[in-house]
Amino acid sequence: MPYTGRENYPYYQEELASPSALWSDLYALTMAQALWEDGRHNAQATFHGFIRTAPYDGQYLLTAGQNIVLEWMDKNWKFDEADIYTLAKKTITGPDGKEHKLFKPEFLEMLKNSQLDLTIDAMPEGELAFPAEPIFRVNGPLWQGLMVEAAILNTVNSQSNFATYASHLKTAAGGAPVLEFGLRRAQAVGGLSSTRGAFVGGADISSNVWAERCYDIPTKGTMAHAFIMCYEDELTAFKAWAKGMPYNGIFLVDTYDTLHGVENAINVCKENGLHLSGIRLDSGDLSYLSKEARKLLDAAGFGEAKITASNDLDRATINALKQDGAKIDYWTVGTALVTAKEQPGLGGVYKIGAVFDEKITAKEVDAMRDAVREGKKSPDEIRQHARELMKLSGDAIKMSYPGELDVVRYLKSGENGQLYFDGGTILSNWQEDPIKYKD
């Protein structure tokens, strides 16, 4: 499934999809052996991945990570010799105090020879999802559906969390460019997960060059305070920058005195006939300084120069600065975005919805689903062959919906608010508007 939410986004050289089939919690394997021993491991089953509540006090989730999961399943889901060795050496202490092998050799042989036989339906990345709507639907052998749970949740929870917060930042910025400059604060080596999720969610630019290599995410960067401080004074540093980077005329102006730094940037560009692309403010009263800097830039004839703000920005500070009339064109967000500081965890879950009789083969189930997609059968006919499953709980939000679930979405169009079927952004067995089959 290619990512369609952003133009020219590449199908992956996926650095994040490199683990083997052991990208899983151990209990998936212990359940798999118990099912295998009972002869039920290949029963056809259906699972759904979804959220229970929307993050950030909002109403939606901006989904991301689906392509990573699909790439991993397509290219790397297999048990190699190192995987089998890891499992073969696991032991458990029995009631007799002796160590026993956790996994049987015959079961490990089954794993070694297995190929992934799951059918995955998913919303496209960048699509909005709402609580209880399946983002993923997984059909196939019961044991394999259990095996991929952790990888799906690990990926889609984190990616969607970053993407959703980035979308909220973009809204707070009023559509102005949002720059993800948080690599040094990211909580994973390489920072790929947060940078990628932020880009899917609407961040325009990153500082992470590794992410550009892997995903072609555009990067930008100028100077740090260290560059300025290693020269005798700010003006000398700016002259050196202008000489070495004549087409990258963005100056960090707050190392010593911010407004004097703006004047130095103006003078250097005027003296050298350079285009002053912009300045960056990284400390102090960003609202006041941006307004004063704007006056200086406009008076000097650099009305097109952009003002970029940084310094631990988040959704609240951006909103406050916007309300105060700050003259900021670009918003640079680091820590708050790459750590999902407002809500570090997303509680997406993965639940079983149906299981078929072991005598019904995958080929037979696929034929039934194909008939539904072609409009020859209703989904009700599939339900006749499956045992629909529902998790019960005293906590209503933890109850799950039974059966094979679709997401059928209708959008309002025009002044009259006429509803129309949106077939391009759904997770459904239907290729056409299902309302026509409702009778």
Feature map (PLM): residue ranges:
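Ordered alpha/beta subdomains of enzyme catalytic regions
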Residues: 1-245, 259, 275, 350-439
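Structured core elements
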Residues: 48-50, 119, 136-137, 180, ...
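Short beta-strand/loop segments at the ligand-binding rim of alpha/beta enzyme cores
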Residues: 113-115, 175, 296-310, 327-328
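Glycine-rich beta-to-alpha transition loops that act as phosphate-gripper elements at the mouths
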Residues: 123, 183-184, 307-315, 334-336
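Glycine- and Gly-Pro-enriched alpha-helical subdomains that act as flexible
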Residues: 218-307
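Short, charged, surface-exposed secondary-structure boundary motifs
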Residues: 231, 288-291, 317, 339-347
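Catalytic cores of alpha/beta
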Residues: 260, 264-268, 313-327
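Glycine-rich phosphate-binding active-site loops on the catalytic face of alpha/beta enzymes
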Residues: 327-345
